[in-house]
Amino acid sequence: WLSCQNFINTREYNEQYRSTKKRWFMADFYQQQRKRLDILMEDGKPEGGKWSFDADNRKKIPKAKRHLIPDLEFPETNPWVDEAEAYVSQHFNDAIGDVAPLLYPVTFEAAETWLQGFLVQRFSNFGDYEDALVPHQTWLYHSVLTPMMNIGLLTPQQVVDAALQYANRADVIDSDGPISIASLEGFVRQIIGWREFMRATYDDLGATMRSGNHWGHHHRLPKSFYDGTTGIAPIDDV
């Protein structure tokens, strides 16, 4: 078997890691990832003095700054996308969701452009506002790179390398929008930490998680969760 480029860790490494532990936790896994991959490390210690700057990733976006949130530059359509949209509209017209407009890149070139757009336009504010919610706003300062990594248009290693290289560029460091350690670490944590941890957990416990009912719930989700009328703002509005 060829190794899967969609993830940084191999399944064999994850199995070996889990075999030594009765339970595993994301924080421990992430620290091991940082050490093993030698990412954001200085003399064996975490750059910036701590492993996670998660506490610095929870700021609200001030109303006076909401107009500064950059718009995403969505990719242009092409004949193959048009053909796919027509096919889905014809054969799956009753399916949930909309086929248009095209939101995500579908080529390697467009995916690379999307990645660079994030680094230049949104990366510097990613850390501060990673957990922020704004009414009627979807993207904020997020990278929106997961779809491209999931289907192989970008690899996680490629994304991490690009982020580290961009943050360490002299012109970026000396600019009005340098990449703080909170932004850089927070972004790296999502990819080498959470994304890899959840893949490892899913490989090991996926069947149990899919078929289990840990909380003993038996009621169906009400219609309000689907049409956005729960009265809970983050669900209805964001």
Regions found by a protein language model. Name each.
Residues 1-104:
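Beta-rich, aromatic/charged-enriched effector core domains that present basic-aromatic interfaces
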